[in-house]
């Protein structure tokens, strides 16, 4: 039986964090931050089972591109103490297979966030090589604002 764990945090500039760095790390990808000029490359990272972006139907096509999405979010927030994204980390039942875990997270994100106008950047992580082999979990990065057709 899975043990419930959900943690919600904000990604804010005042804490020295950025949405581009968080998205690159959680998805094991490479993102160049246009605001700072920094490059975040985590493509060599292992343990990421599934990545996906869910966006409202009216969202522009570029919202499906991780680098474009999070750079647009960073550009839209101009204050030095801006909260640029919300992150949710949730434990997933080890009793489910991979496909069932993906569907569970998709359904949760669609109902709770995407249907309310937010974009959800999903990354499912496998348990680490050392430690509890039941530690399947998801990282969900969310826009803090609704996204419209014009962005």
PLM segments and residue spans:
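N-terminal nicking endonuclease/strand-transfer module with a His-rich metal-binding environment
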Residues: 1-151
